[in-house]
Amino acid sequence: MSSAPKLFRVIGGAQNYDWGKLGSTSAVARFAKLNDPENVSIEEEKPYAELWMGTHPSVPTVSAQDRTPLRDLVRAAPEEMLGQDIIDKFGSKEGIPFLFKVLSIRKVLSIQAHPDKALARQLHASDPKHYPDDNHKPEMAVAITDFEAFCGFKPLAEIDALLQKIPEFRELVGDDVVAEFHSGIDSSDVAGKKKLLQKVFSRVMNSPESKFEPLAARLVERTKSDPQLFGETLADLIQRLDAQFPNDIGLFCGCLLLNHCILKSGEAMFLEAKDPHAYISGDIMECMAASDNVIRAGFTPKFKDVEVLVDCLTYSFNPVEEQKLKPAPFPRGTGVAELKLYDPPIDEFSVLQTTFTSAGAEKFEGLDGPSLLIVTEGKGKIKLQGSDEALDASTGNIFFVAPKAAIELVSESKDTFTSYRAFCEA
């Protein structure tokens, strides 16, 4: 007899980092309140940054019925909650291999990258205080409102144009490296071009405050006196981020070196290990491998590991459109809903968006691993196929779905009913 339920509601944990949206402007706060109204009261002056769903011990997700941590339920019945194939593949009976989050961003997050598995093992062994585990941390973001981020380095010709026309950028990098970069970027030697980009980034990141702070102040002034030099979008971006982090190195290493990526609701981007990125504003669903390893560079008062960062990045340089992850169809559901699968090229997770705009049902085959589903808009029902017991599924509600459990989502009106389901399969 199976003891663990195959479908049940859970409650995630909210994080109040300073960069979060304030009070009820935050999707995190609204979802947390709607899912647990008796225990959550929104403080309007307080930032609500992240809502965590998973088995990470830092911020427990608990059963809505009796507040038992999901991690404890998994550890008590790993074969039923994870599936033997997932246990074998990831080598753990302790938890779900991914962490699913809602993020509501008011202020820019630190420019950062995450190590791959080999580097994570090395960093964790040498500096466990700053690198708490030995796992990699690929991430995917799906916008649920208009969202902007830095992601990956700009194409080299764009960086070269900025170095040529913005005196403060040129002075920070140095005429010698600027000239070498300018003459080398048309080469067919990709590895050589990556080395040149690394030189530029290293000069920026290793410049002392006494050098970059006055240059940053001049840079901001130039965006006001000569905005057409930058273009309206970039000038505005530099001014907005300077207001949040005055004279920060991120104005150079973020605004002038990284792609400014703007996503509409439903658009996604995948961030591979060792790619620099930073979220700027908006609300997203984020899914990642279950790790806490971060190598930071700018827009942060926290520990910056410049040497590791400069050494580890891939230095890929691609147009901003190539940073986006296009959704694919999902053939394992039948019914009236629109299904979009966000399936990055890694093992730990995929995310399925299900949207109803009419009354009706969508039936899903059982998946070969655990999943977590959150309703982000509207309301409907969720149930196991063949069961008479349907659970209310409304905005903010989160559900755990066990491996092989075939579920059904039901919309009872023409109002939009949207959910996101993160899952992992062997």
UniProtKB/Swiss-Prot annotation:
Active-site residues (renumbered): R296
Keyword Zinc: yes
One Gene Ontology CC term in the entry: cytosol
Cofactor needs: Zn(2+)
UniProt signal peptide: none
InterPro entries assigned to the protein according to its UniProt record, in alphabetical order: Man6P_Isoase-1, Mannose-6-P_Isomerase, Pmannose_isomerase-type1_CS, PMI_typeI_C, PMI_typeI_cat, PMI_typeI_hel, RmlC-like_jellyroll, RmlC_Cupin_sf
Originating species: Ogataea parapolymorpha (strain ATCC 26012 / BCRC 20466 / JCM 22074 / NRRL Y-7560 / DL-1) (Yeast)
Pathway in which the depicted protein is active: Nucleotide-sugar biosynthesis; GDP-alpha-D-mannose biosynthesis; alpha-D-mannose 1-phosphate from D-fructose 6-phosphate: step 1/2
Pfam families named among the record's database cross-references: PMI_typeI_C, PMI_typeI_cat, PMI_typeI_hel
NCBIfam families documented for this protein: manA
Residues annotated as binding Zn(2+): Q112, H114, E139, H277
Keywords tagged on the record: Cytoplasm, Isomerase, Metal-binding, Zinc
Record's protein name: Mannose-6-phosphate isomerase
Source species, domain of life: Eukaryota
GO molecular function: mannose-6-phosphate isomerase activity; zinc ion binding
Function: Involved in the synthesis of the GDP-mannose and dolichol-phosphate-mannose required for a number of critical mannosyl transfer reactions.
Subcellular localization(s) per the UniProt record: Cytoplasm
PROSITE patterns xrefs: PMI_I_1, PMI_I_2
Entry note: cofactor: Binds 1 zinc ion per subunit.
Gene assigned in the entry: PMI40
CDD domains noted in UniProt: cupin_PMI_type_I_N
Enzyme class: isomerase
Family under the similarity heading: Belongs to the mannose-6-phosphate isomerase type 1 family.
Reaction(s) catalysed (UniProt annotation): D-mannose 6-phosphate = D-fructose 6-phosphate
EC number: 5.3.1.8
Gene Ontology terms: biological process: carbohydrate metabolic process; cell wall mannoprotein biosynthetic process; GDP-mannose biosynthetic process; protein glycosylation
